[in-house]
């Protein structure tokens, strides 16, 4: 097993008397963008929490760079993986610049000014720097959370490690959806960052993911390229939706249409 991987082996998780994740095995590697899709209640957020170390499986294990997640200290793990949650509250009246600066806590004692300026620019947050975080719109807050996640993982020339995102586009308009996913895709091309994000929009997953993981009732129903996973037969069976899949002539990307 390569030390540069995050490897999950036979993960199981139960809560409230229900099995939420059952027998999931997968590998995440730097240099790729992975989309986690599936219907409501499939277990996507639970799996993300298991992969990022926020939950412990009742069976199976996750290994990051050859070591079980359970043996990493919180400080060590904070330098190697970051999580952008759907929502997060800030209890006090902090400005955006102050909120983003908090993400550099794992790197205390190292210069942060250049890093913060870089991530604020990349995420389009520089014009928000002096505003109070709690006063921002939902979409603006999502962009700030992305800036925080990138700041947490930023090393000499860019982010390194594993970045997990739970529905990062849910509050964004079309322009900012494209900008966020395009940025994540470009950052992974350097080969030092692995991105795993939950997406409800399967067309966004088709457009930007190198690999798609399709989760159904806590099990991994399919894993592969967008063309391999996003087939009519597979999507109809999983989502129970009346849909069509066509391939874009321009770039060969599958495009999913709902029928009336």
Swiss-Prot record:
<dbReference type="InterPro" id="IPR017871">
    <property type="entry name" value="ABC_transporter-like_CS"/>
</dbReference>
<keyword id="KW-1278">Translocase</keyword>
<dbReference type="GO" id="GO:0005524">
    <property type="term" value="F:ATP binding"/>
</dbReference>
<keyword id="KW-0547">Nucleotide-binding</keyword>
<comment type="function">
    <text>Part of the ABC transporter complex HmuTUV involved in hemin import. Responsible for energy coupling to the transport system.</text>
</comment>
<keyword id="KW-0067">ATP-binding</keyword>
<dbReference type="GO" id="GO:0016887">
    <property type="term" value="F:ATP hydrolysis activity"/>
</dbReference>
<keyword id="KW-0997">Cell inner membrane</keyword>
<keyword id="KW-0813">Transport</keyword>
<dbReference type="InterPro" id="IPR003439">
    <property type="entry name" value="ABC_transporter-like_ATP-bd"/>
</dbReference>
<keyword id="KW-0472">Membrane</keyword>
<comment type="similarity">
    <text>Belongs to the ABC transporter superfamily. Heme (hemin) importer (TC 3.A.1.14.5) family.</text>
</comment>
<feature type="domain" description="ABC transporter">
    <location>
        <begin position="6"/>
        <end position="242"/>
    </location>
</feature>
<dbReference type="GO" id="GO:0005886">
    <property type="term" value="C:plasma membrane"/>
</dbReference>
<dbReference type="InterPro" id="IPR027417">
    <property type="entry name" value="P-loop_NTPase"/>
</dbReference>
<comment type="subunit">
    <text>The complex is composed of two ATP-binding proteins (HmuV), two transmembrane proteins (HmuU) and a solute-binding protein (HmuT).</text>
</comment>
<feature type="binding site">
    <location>
        <begin position="38"/>
        <end position="45"/>
    </location>
    <ligand>
        <name>ATP</name>
    </ligand>
</feature>
<keyword id="KW-1003">Cell membrane</keyword>
<dbReference type="Pfam" id="PF00005">
    <property type="entry name" value="ABC_tran"/>
</dbReference>
<protein>
    <recommendedName>
        <fullName>Hemin import ATP-binding protein HmuV</fullName>
        <ecNumber>7.6.2.-</ecNumber>
    </recommendedName>
</protein>
<dbReference type="InterPro" id="IPR003593">
    <property type="entry name" value="AAA+_ATPase"/>
</dbReference>
């Amino acid at each position: 097993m390569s030390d540069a991987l995050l490897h999950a082996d036979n993960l199981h998780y139960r809560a409230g008397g229900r099995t939420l994740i059952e027998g999931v095995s997968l590998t995440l590697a730097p240099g790729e963008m992975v989309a986690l899709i599936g219907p409501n209640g499939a277990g996507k957020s639970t799996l993300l929490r298991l992969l990022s170390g926020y939950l412990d499986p009742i069976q199976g294990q996750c290994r990051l760079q050859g070591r079980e997640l359970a043996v990493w200290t919180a400080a060590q793990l904070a330098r190697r993986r970051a999580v952008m949650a759907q929502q997060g509250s800030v209890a006090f009246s902090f400005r955006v610049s102050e909120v983003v600066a908090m993400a550099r806590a794992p790197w205390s004692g190292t210069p942060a000014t250049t890093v913060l300026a870089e991530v604020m620019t990349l995420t389009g947050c520089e014009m928000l720097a002096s505003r109070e975080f709690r006063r921002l719109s939902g979409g603006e807050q999502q962009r700030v959370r992305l800036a925080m996640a990138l700041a947490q993982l930023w090393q000499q020339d860019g982010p390194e490690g594993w970045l997990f995102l739970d529905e990062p586009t849910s509050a964004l308009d079309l322009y900012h959806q494209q900008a966020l996913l395009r940025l994540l895709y470009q950052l992974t091309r350097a080969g030092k960052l692995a991105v795993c994000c939950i997406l409800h929009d399967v067309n966004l997953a088709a457009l930007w993911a190198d690999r798609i993981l399709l989760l159904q009732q806590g099990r991994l129903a399919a894993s592969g390229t967008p063309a391999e996973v996003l087939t009519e037969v597979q999507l109809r069976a999983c989502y129970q939706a009346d849909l069509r899949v066509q391939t874009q002539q321009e770039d060969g990307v599958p495009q999913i249409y709902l029928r009336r």
